[in-house]
Amino acid sequence: MFCNVRLELDLPFAHSLKEKRRTVRSLKDRLRRKNVSVVESSNQDFWQRATLELSLAAVSLGAAEEKREEVRRMLVNYDEIMIADLREEFVKL
């Protein structure tokens, strides 16, 4: 079971591309520590917007939902970002 998530983020505290990259890099590092694959897919040139694509794998739907909820809690509690849009999709192979 795979879970794919597309995040549209607002970065209200970023005042330059350098600050945005620092924030996004920190967020990506935290997600990778939770065994989540992550890539910044668009909005690279906008300093207060970011679009991230996340993917995680699990052995069952229940485990994927649990991991996804853990990631969602971490994102909500991350002070430097605001979630503008979140789309998720579960894929069973």
Model-predicted regions and their roles:
Residues 2-4, 31-33, 47-49:
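Short connector loops at helix/strand junctions that flank enzyme active sites
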Residues 3-8, 53-54:
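Active-site-flanking beta-strand signature of metal-NTP-handling nucleotidyl enzymes
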Residues 9-13, 56-58:
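Beta-strand elements of well-folded, non-transmembrane domains
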Residues 18-37:
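Short amphipathic alpha-helix segments
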Residues 34-42, 84-85:
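A short linear hydrophobic-aromatic micro-motif
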Residues 39-59, 91-92:
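Short, charge-patterned binding micro-sites
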Residues 57-93:
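C-terminal structural segments of small proteins and small subunits
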